[in-house]
Amino acid sequence: MGRGKLEIRKIENKTNRQVTFSKRRNGIMKKAQELTVLCDAKVSLLMISSTHKLHHYLSPGVSLKKMYDEYQKIEGVDLWRKQWERMQEQHRKVLELNSLLRREISRRMGGDLEGLTLVELSALQQEMEEAIIQIRNKKYHTIKNQTGTTRKKIKNLEERHTDLVMELEAKFRGPQFAIGEDDPRNYEAAAAAAVYGNDVAAANLFALSRHPIT
């Protein structure tokens, strides 16, 4: 009993689909090689699978460009003309946009004003005035932020300075560090504490007594 006719339709199972593609791809490649050898034909074969993998075959000594050129020559068509025309149109639009932007920049710098009507000049003036207002507001905002940051730094330094002064006052508040300029005994006691006590605070106090800060 012969085999039934295989219905040609998409294979839904991905694994089966890939297996079938590989088998039939190899068969087509083999047929293309046979046509090249047996019939001295120029064969170009391109295949892209459902997984977006490219498979191709070209007869020995033949390039894809040569095949395209020969096809265009035989058929009398230009495969690239529409693409070239599209690229030319895009290039023209880019040049026009570039020229327009250069002219707008020049006008905002006070140049290329010839030919503008009174309405156009008034509109340009209004745009420039609005731009100046935005720039001024941005400048004031930046100055305000920087001023606030500087004030915070100054406040922190002042608080640190106050803490240091309070620490020094607490350290020198004891009677052993009291200095009386009119009492030589207090002066000698501070000097002795600085020399023999090896105390940094006492040494500083002694130095201040000799060279007071005014």
Swiss-Prot record:
One record GO biological process: positive regulation of transcription by RNA polymerase II
Keywords for this protein: DNA-binding, Nucleus, Transcription, Transcription regulation
One family name in Pfam for this protein: SRF-TF
Expression sites by tissue: In flowers. Not found in vegetative tissues.
Protein localization: Nucleus
Any one of the GO CC terms: nucleus
Protein name from the UniProt record: MADS-box protein CMB2
Organism: Dianthus caryophyllus
